[in-house]
Amino acid sequence: VLNNDLLPLFLKHCNNPNLWLASRAIDSSRPNSRLLKKALRLAEKDDISTVAHVNAATITDNYWIRPIGSNLTYNDVKFSDDYFSNLALKGNYDSFNKAATSKKSRTPELTNVGSFEKCWKLRNGKWWMYKKASHNEMFSELFAYELGNELGFNMAIYERGKGFIKSLDFTDSASVNFEPASTFMKKNEDYLD
């Protein structure tokens, strides 16, 4: 750690780097995550190795890791393309073949957490989260978005797609760092404090 003031809140509260790294990994129970790891030919597929493959970088914050003695900078590790997005979202044969024959291996999909099949797509210089969703799942997300707007809340932008819902990266390419609510609440799931 070069500067404790720049640590993620998770590490300030928990001081467990391995747990923090594992929390940033793509959900291995997602079938498309397993296809992605196979296409990338990751030698080690555990959560920490998966995250280390992309220096623990994500779209929604500036936190990342650098090997000891390395001269890497954030500009070297931040993501600049969405080459593997279709494989992560759709998991179809064509997407797998394209990914498996690519020389590229850095992808924000390896740190795209959550249980739904999803991906990051770069559109006109902006990152969008595309998430597979049923009609009811789309309705609930769009309803919450519209309700929040009507109540005057500052909401992440959501749009309906065909078989998916998409949301504009509300961090604006990590101009602010997203910290999950669990970081603040810790084990206080009843919100009593």
Residue locations for each model-derived region?
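Phosphate/dinucleotide-binding and metal-coordinating scaffold of catalytic cores
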Residues: 1-193
